[in-house]
């Protein structure tokens, strides 16, 4: 069954002429969601706005600065043509079947027709839904700023991700471990469908709806799968390949997600749901960024295997449609092929290895081992390495290591490998592959502390740096420096 195309709706009165709301997800039918209005956010104010994303969506810059936009993007005002809803899904959380979950505080307004195609607009923190369970449906300022900045930072790094148009705040109190204040993040994505959506309809034996959902995803996002002999196996294979490339991007940049439950896995291979994430400071393969994960299920070095485990769950959910277990397992094999290839390609770029040679994999592995044994700052190492030449003394890189003998041995190996490479070409490749700026925990924490005092300059400064993280940004070197000692005491959990 193919989802019916959207019928024209009234023009969106707050966008450029010709842009219209639709809601293709709503056409799946009421068994997939509950329609409801957002809960108004009292006395909202702007915290941060991505004008770059607004332009991509076809919105005028001045609109995102308007009082009207503030009301719409906090859920305080409805707009013609939008059809707010919360979707239902299930999932495995920390490896255990959690049953029915769903959008407990996120409300989809609809999809906006943009120059790049439809983009769903979702308000996170917009109030209780039938899927809130014991939650209050709100998000807090702290976690909302982190998600806003991380979404745009990952996009700036070229890593597939949902986006964030803005974050708005309110003085309305919200109880977590302490009393905090409410906020709403406006998220955008071609689709917010997760592995957990498929699990929900499969494990509740709603196989007709499972097929409807799979057909919707194939026809909307994986049309080439429709031509396959077994379209649903092809969908599993395509999702596996996208997820493999995403994991390669995470590992190469030093990103820890923190809570890779199946309901936090995008069917489109996007990074989604920024909670207790972290970009690595000192390189530690076993780093655990989530204080709520004491066993380290989602540690940095376990992410690739967890992604495969989650894909296996997706394969099980799709089995009623694929009907052949061996075919499903064969579709999953693409992950095992694509991930190491994609990771090696990214690491070659980071090392400036313009052409592939035998021994590159061994050089990559020795680099990781050297960084781990010396606990070297991951981002700073790679950025400084951009200036490494076989003829130089490499002092700025060597200074990062306490085991100078091991570094010297590695530097000799690396120098021999890049000796025949054009240094200008190599440096250019490396400068585009190794960012100067990432969203370190302490930078986010400083911006959050200021924002709690109604000073949003830190949020806006960070946003500008993170949207162009490979640029030098003169005068902002402090944002690319080593983290302060107190940064190691920051604890990030699932609380948001």
From Swiss-Prot:
Q: Does the keyword S-adenosyl-L-methionine apply?
A: no
Q: Which GO terms describe its molecular function?
A: AMPylase activity; ATP binding; magnesium ion binding
Listed under catalytic activity are: L-seryl-[protein] + ATP = 3-O-(5'-adenylyl)-L-seryl-[protein] + diphosphate; L-threonyl-[protein] + ATP = 3-O-(5'-adenylyl)-L-threonyl-[protein] + diphosphate; L-tyrosyl-[protein] + ATP = O-(5'-adenylyl)-L-tyrosyl-[protein] + diphosphate; L-histidyl-[protein] + UTP = N(tele)-(5'-uridylyl)-L-histidyl-[protein] + diphosphate
Highest taxon in the source lineage = Bacteria
The Enzyme Commission number assigned here is: 2.7.7.-, 2.7.7.108
Question: What residues bind Mg(2+), as annotated?
Answer: 264, 273
Provide the active-site residues from the annotation.
263 (proton acceptor)
Entry keywords, A to Z: ATP-binding, Magnesium, Manganese, Metal-binding, Nucleotide-binding, Nucleotidyltransferase, Transferase
InterPro entries annotated for this entry?
A: SelO
Q: What does this protein do?
A: Nucleotidyltransferase involved in the post-translational modification of proteins. It can catalyze the addition of adenosine monophosphate (AMP) or uridine monophosphate (UMP) to a protein, resulting in modifications known as AMPylation and UMPylation.
Q: Could you say which protein family the record assigns here?
A: Belongs to the SELO family.
**What is the name listed in the Swiss-Prot or TrEMBL entry for this protein?**
Protein nucleotidyltransferase YdiU
């Amino acid at each position: 069954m193919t989802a019916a195309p959207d019928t024209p709706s009234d023009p969106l009165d707050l966008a450029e002429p010709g842009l219209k709301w639709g809601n293709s997800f709503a056409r799946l039918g009421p068994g997939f969601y509950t329609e409801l209005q957002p809960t108004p956010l009292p006395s909202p104010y702007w915290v941060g706005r991505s004008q770059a994303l607004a332009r991509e969506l076809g919105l005028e810059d001045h609109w995102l600065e308007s009082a009207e936009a503030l009301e719409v993007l906090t859920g305080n005002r409805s707009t013609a043509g939008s059809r707010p809803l919360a979707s239902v899904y299930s999932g495995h959380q920390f490896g255990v079947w959690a049953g029915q979950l769903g959008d407990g505080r996120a409300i989809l307004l609809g999809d906006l027709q943009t120059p790049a195609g439809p983009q769903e607009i979702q308000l996170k923190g917009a109030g209780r839904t039938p899927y809130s369970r014991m939650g209050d449906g709100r998000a807090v300022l702290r976690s909302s700023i982190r998600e806003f900045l991380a979404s745009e930072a990952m996009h700036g790094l070229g890593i597939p991700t949902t986006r964030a148009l803005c974050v708005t705040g309110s003085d309305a109190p919200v109880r977590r471990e302490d009393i905090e204040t409410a906020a709403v993040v406006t998220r955008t994505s071609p689709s917010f469908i997760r592995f957990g959506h498929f699990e929900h309809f499969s494990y509740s034996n709603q196989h007709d709806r499972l097929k409807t959902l799979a057909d919707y995803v194939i026809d909307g996002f994986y049309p080439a799968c429709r031509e396959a002999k077994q379209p649903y196996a092809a969908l599993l294979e395509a999702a596996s390949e996208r997820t493999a490339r995403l994991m390669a991007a995470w590992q190469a940049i030093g990103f820890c997600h923190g809570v890779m439950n199946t309901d936090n896995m995008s069917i489109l291979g996007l990074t989604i749901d920024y909670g207790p994430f972290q970009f690595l400071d000192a390189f530690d393969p076993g780093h655990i960024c989530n204080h709520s994960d004491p066993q380290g299920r989602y540690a940095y070095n376990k992410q690739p295997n967890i992604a495969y485990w989650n894909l296996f769950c997706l394969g099980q959910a799709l089995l009623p449609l694929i009907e052949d277990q061996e075919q499903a397992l064969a579709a999953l094999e693409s992950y095992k092929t694509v991930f190491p290839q994609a990771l090696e390609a990214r690491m070659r770029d980071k090392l400036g290895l313009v052409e592939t040679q035998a021994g590159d994999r061994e050089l990559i592995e020795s680099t990781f081992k050297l960084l781990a044994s010396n606990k070297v700052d991951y981002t700073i190492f790679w950025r400084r390495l951009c200036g490494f030449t076989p003829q130089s003394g490499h002092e700025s890189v060597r200074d990062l290591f306490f085991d100078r003998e091991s570094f010297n041995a590695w530097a000799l190996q690396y120098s021999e490998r890049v000796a025949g490479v054009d240094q200008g070409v190599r440096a250019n490749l490396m400068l585009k592959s190794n960012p100067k700026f990432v969203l370190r925990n302490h930078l986010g924490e400083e911006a959050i502390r200021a924002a709690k005092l109604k000073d949003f300059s830190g949020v806006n400064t960070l946003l500008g740096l993170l949207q162009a993280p490979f640029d030098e940004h003169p005068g902002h070197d402090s944002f690319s420096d080593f983290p302060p000692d107190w940064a190691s005491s920051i604890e990030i959990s699932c609380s948001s």
